[in-house]
């Protein structure tokens, strides 16, 4: 069975990336002492992109290129595993991108494992984004079945990236089970409501020993920047790009926001102060006191 997409990733073509006008030394990830790694593989981009909800496969392809993403996730239920159909979604994934099949729609651990095995057989990749979402109203991840599936998949040789609730205890359990990342939700899938779980994500970031990828609910580039600023290692975005008026432009905006957020985190973003009054950034008290007679129009100044 011929593979269309493999785990082997290229060094991204500079023409594909929003930061392509900069040198390698200017890139906030390449050559930095904390590059983005998943299971030992280094990726240049910290933006992961999904493939659902696009108006057409060509629009999806162009948006993926504009995003500069190295990793693209696709629901196994949308893939023609028999490879008999024409125009399958995988045919429009740009060459060299790392495919991350997901088990979207799985109701329990057994179904998730079955989908993952089918995907591995069809694509040749052991990477899998684990999703177990039995509640059709919220698509909330089932914590019990997610952990159970993670244990089964790791034992079966998969590199598991689990979508999970923003629960620090569950995140620790998934890490202990051998997951390569944890992927806490920002808010409900497809809701575009941003980081409603910010406090919990910060707690996960503080203790996680594997990359933290914020997944679900990221509705604007500012949400992606916020996630990166508080220390997330990466973000996964789909709906906000796919349903934008201009998906290609939105993909580029998310790419730049992810880079900016990461740079802000590395630069040491100041925490919000506790003061309830303003604090001048440039006090003039000493300066005014040194001016004979003060300044006209200011307290103590000339008329």
From Swiss-Prot:
Residues 1-37 are annotated as: Disordered. It is found in: Cytoplasm. Keywords: Cytoplasm, Schiff base, Thiamine biosynthesis, Transferase. Residues 1-35 have a biased composition (Basic and acidic residues). One of its GO terms (cellular component) is cytoplasm. 1-deoxy-D-xylulose 5-phosphate binds at residues 190, 216-217, 238-239. GO terms for biological process: thiamine diphosphate biosynthetic process. Disulfide bonds: none annotated. Its EC number is 2.8.1.10. It catalyses: [ThiS sulfur-carrier protein]-C-terminal-Gly-aminoethanethioate + 2-iminoacetate + 1-deoxy-D-xylulose 5-phosphate = [ThiS sulfur-carrier protein]-C-terminal Gly-Gly + 2-[(2R,5Z)-2-carboxy-4-methylthiazol-5(2H)-ylidene]ethyl phosphate + 2 H2O + H(+). Catalyzes the rearrangement of 1-deoxy-D-xylulose 5-phosphate (DXP) to produce the thiazole phosphate moiety of thiamine. Sulfur is provided by the thiocarboxylate moiety of the carrier protein ThiS. In vitro, sulfur can be provided by H(2)S. Homotetramer. Forms heterodimers with either ThiH or ThiS. Belongs to the ThiG family. PANTHER family: THIAZOLE SYNTHASE. This is Thiazole synthase. It comes from Parafrankia sp. (strain EAN1pec). The gene is thiG.
């Amino acid at each position: 069975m011929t593979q269309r997409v493999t785990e082997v990733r290229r060094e991204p073509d500079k023409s594909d990336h929003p930061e392509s006008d900069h040198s390698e030394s200017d890139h906030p990830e390449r050559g930095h002492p904390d590059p983005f790694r998943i299971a030992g593989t280094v990726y240049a981009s910290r933006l992961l992109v999904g493939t659902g909800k696009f108006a057409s496969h060509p629009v999806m392809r162009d948006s993926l290129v504009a995003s500069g993403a190295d990793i693209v996730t696709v629901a196994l239920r949308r893939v023609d595993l028999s490879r008999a159909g024409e125009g399958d979604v995988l045919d429009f994934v740009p060459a060299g991108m790392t495919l991350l099949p997901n088990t979207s729609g799985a109701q329990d651990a057994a179904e998730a494992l079955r989908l993952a095995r089918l995907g591995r057989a069809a694509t040749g990749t052991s990477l899998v984004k684990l999703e177990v979402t039995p509640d059709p109203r919220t698509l909330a991840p089932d914590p019990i079945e997610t952990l159970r599936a993670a244990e089964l998949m790791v034992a079966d040789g998969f590199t598991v990236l689990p979508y999970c609730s923003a629960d620090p205890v569950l995140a620790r359990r998934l890490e202990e089970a051998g997951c390569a990342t944890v992927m806490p939700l920002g808010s409900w899938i497809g809701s575009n409501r941003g980081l409603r779980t910010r406090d919990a994500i910060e707690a996960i970031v503080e203790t996680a020993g594997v990359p933290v990828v914020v997944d679900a609910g990221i509705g604007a580039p500012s949400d992606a920047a916020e996630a990166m600023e508080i220390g997330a290692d990466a973000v996964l975005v789909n709906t906000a790009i796919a349903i934008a008026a201009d998906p290609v432009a939105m993909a580029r905006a998310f790419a730049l926001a992810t880079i900016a957020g990461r740079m802000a985190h590395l630069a040491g973003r100041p925490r919000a102060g506790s003061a309830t009054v303003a604090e001048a950034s440039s006090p003039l008290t000493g300066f005014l006191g040194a001016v004979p007679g003060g300044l006209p129009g200011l307290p103590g100044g000339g008329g």
